[in-house]
UniProtKB/Swiss-Prot annotation:
Catalyzes the attachment of proline to tRNA(Pro) in a two-step reaction: proline is first activated by ATP to form Pro-AMP and then transferred to the acceptor end of tRNA(Pro). As ProRS can inadvertently accommodate and process non-cognate amino acids such as alanine and cysteine, to avoid such errors it has two additional distinct editing activities against alanine. One activity is designated as 'pretransfer' editing and involves the tRNA(Pro)-independent hydrolysis of activated Ala-AMP. The lineage of its organism: Bacteria, Pseudomonadati, Spirochaetota, Spirochaetia, Leptospirales. It comes from the Bacteria. GO terms for molecular function: aminoacyl-tRNA deacylase activity; ATP binding; proline-tRNA ligase activity. It comes from Leptospira interrogans serogroup Icterohaemorrhagiae serovar copenhageni (strain Fiocruz L1-130). Its main location: cytoplasm. Consists of three domains: the N-terminal catalytic domain, the editing domain and the C-terminal anticodon-binding domain. It is found in: Cytoplasm. Its EC number is 6.1.1.15. InterPro entries: aa-tRNA-synt_IIb, aa-tRNA-synth_II, aa-tRNA-synth_II/BPL/LPL, Anticodon-bd, Anticodon-bd_dom_sf, Pro-tRNA-ligase_IIa, Pro-tRNA-synth_IIa_bac-type, Pro-tRNA-Synthase_IIa_type1. GO terms for biological process: prolyl-tRNA aminoacylation. This is Proline--tRNA ligase.
């Protein structure tokens, strides 16, 4: 491809609204342009990268025996009603009505559609297992799209769904997908960590996210350097490093705390650590009022709470709603007020420790409150607090380390949630009807592209892994006149005929501009032919990742091609 025939709108300045490297560089390198919040146009260079990632995904999926489909983006509301997710998906799902007032969703995921499609096609255990997938545009009405294509409202996703006669078969495919995902991300040049994760609205019994450690990540990972345990903090069981020792206040007594409603305010006033207090969190879901008590220095983990109570979402109660239950905001006692509210105690609490708690009385707290003495029939404590760095590994009890991560893939064991909802049964070996069990496996293609840039950039721009670079080789020519141009064109044609992907910057621009563009865009290999070649036969070849340039005297096209092939193989080998 010749740059003179290409759309190549590179930019010198960073876009004002771009706060992360991938967003800045995708705009500056001419890969994308913004349409509106969370929506992007893909230009030819950016589209080539996307298509290469898609092809890697397709090859690895096909190698496992998965079958590619293409389903409608519009999905009828009936499908979602049948699974119970029409309301559970909330406001993030785009919903539309046609001229006949029929409701549809712009698919954020396709469990329902594949279930509807495959129900009449799967009749016997002999038809199983089957793993189906598509690579398709998905939609999500993000409340705050940000970080460019990392969190956007429209994105390309590979979503796969497997159907099985039993859990053993499901586990075989789950493990095959786990291996395939590692291969996909390795081939894309990404270093990923599989971590245990919460299944969220997807449901199911097991779930792993493929995470890339990055300071811009929106997820917190907790990792153990001793045994290799890794988990999303949403899923990590809380095991505290140590419990409270002796308390400052052991005698039970009511204390005046005028206007002090927060844990920080109360602990500062009384001179106690936050871990010696009990925090009350009042929430409401669609059908429940919830009151959670946990140690004052900890945060509530909503994902654990929702999973435990089997609810889709919750939000804080207002002060008025709290008072209507007979409670005083900021001064709530751990004693359950009535049966109108679901009360939970986190396992971070010690039953025999004298805590500072709310007194159920305006401007008063109680010191020396011991749960097992004050609350009759104390229930079993639940794990609903958020684990943090320094808490203990659930496998080996070593301290956990926290890292930020970007999720690029996710695999689930869904069980029979959707096959039950859609009545998907087959005859087993004994001729009896059996409900199938399923798995789900997703990869964000655009997000993978952006995350590669987050890992592969420097002050000059992007340095693409050669497997997904828009072109493998950049040929930069610095010439005067038609004769010199024709000579460089001979080089270009030789490389093309050897099957090498070449982007020839033949624009009538200065050498500095061309060289900076090639480094900004991130072509893995650059060949520069200019004045020195026409004077002494000297050519330079540049490794973008190493930022290393070597010169040699041209001795023939075979030698040039051999040098390029050697560097290509070196760059591909680094991905294994």
């Amino acid at each position: 491809m010749k740059a003179s025939k290409y759309i190549l709108p590179t930019e010198k300045e960073n876009p004002a609204d771009a706060v992360v490297a991938s967003h800045r560089l995708m705009i500056r390198a001419g890969l994308v342009r913004k349409s509106s919040a969370g929506l992007y146009f893909y230009l030819p260079l950016g589209l080539k990268v996307l298509k290469k990632i898609e092809q890697i995904v397709r090859e690895e999926m096909n190698s496992t025996g998965a079958l590619e489909f293409d389903l409608p983006i519009l999905t009828p509301s009936d499908f979602w009603e049948q699974s119970g997710r029409w309301s559970a998906m909330g406001k993030e799902m785009f919903r539309i009505q046609d001229r006949h007032d029929l409701s549809y969703a712009l698919g954020p995921t396709h469990e329902e559609s594949f279930s509807f499609l495959l129900k009449p096609l799967l009749k016997s255990y002999k038809d199983l297992p089957v793993n189906v997938y598509q690579i398709q545009t998905k939609f999500r009405d993000e409340i705050r799209p940000r970080f460019g294509v990392i969190r956007s409202r429209e994105f390309i996703m590979k979503d796969a769904y497997s159907f099985h006669i039993d859990d053993s078969s499901l586990d075989d495919t789950y493990q095959a997908m786990r291996v395939a995902y590692r291969k996909i991300f390795d081939r894309c040049g990404l270093k990923t960590i599989p971590v245990q994760a919460d299944s969220g609205s997807m449901g199911g019994s097991a779930s792993e996210e493929f995470m890339v450690v990055s300071p811009i990540g929106e997820e917190t990972l907790l990792l153990c350097n001793s045994c290799g345990y890794s988990s999303n903090s949403e899923k990590t069981p809380l095991i505290l490093k140590k419990e409270n020792g002796s308390a400052k206040f052991s005698e039970k007594k009511e204390i005046s705390t005028p206007g002090k409603k927060t844990i920080s305010e109360v602990s500062t006033l009384l001179g106690v650590s936050e871990s010696e207090t009990i925090k009350a969190v009042a929430l409401k879901s669609e059908k429940k009022k919830i009151l959670v008590f946990l140690r004052g220095d900890l945060e509530l983990n909503l994902h654990k709470l929702h999973s435990l109570l089997k609810i889709a979402d919750s939000e804080p109660m207002t002060d008025l709603e709290i008072r209507e239950l007979g409670l005083i905001p900021g001064f709530i006692s751990p004693i359950a007020p009535n049966d109108k509210i679901k009360v939970l105690y986190d396992r971070s609490l010690q039953k025999d420790f004298p805590y500072v708690v709310g007194s159920s009385k305006e401007d008063f707290h109680t010191q020396g409150f011991i749960l097992e003495k004050e609350i009759s029939g104390l229930p079993e404590f639940a794990d609903v607090a958020l684990a943090r760095e320094g808490d203990l590994c659930p496998n080996c009890s070593s301290p956990l380390k926290a890292e930020k991560g970007i999720e690029v893939g996710h695999i689930f064991k869904l069980g029979d949630k959707y096959t039950k909802a859609f009545g998907i049964q087959v005859l087993d070996q004994n001729g009896k009807s059996k409900t199938l069990t399923t798995g789900c496996y997703g990869i964000g293609v655009n997000r993978t592209m952006a995350t590669v840039i987050e890992q592969c950039n420097d002050e000059k721009g992007i340095f693409w892994p050669i497997s997904i670079a828009p072109f493998e080789v950049s040929l930069v020519s610095i010439v005067k006149g038609e004769d010199q141009y024709s000579k460089i064109e001979e080089f270009y044609n030789v490389l093309i005929n050897e099957g090498i992907e070449v982007f020839w910057d033949d624009r009538d621009l200065g050498p500095g501009f061309k060289l900076k563009d090639s480094e900004l865009i991130g072509f893995p290999i650059r060949i520069t032919i200019g004045k020195k070649f026409f004077e002494s036969g000297e050519i330079s070849i540049y490794n973008r990742k190493k930022d290393q340039e070597d010169s040699f005297v041209f001795s023939g096209f075979d030698d040039l091609v051999a040098r390029v092939e050697s560097m290509r193989q070196e760059l591909f080998t680094e991905l294994r």
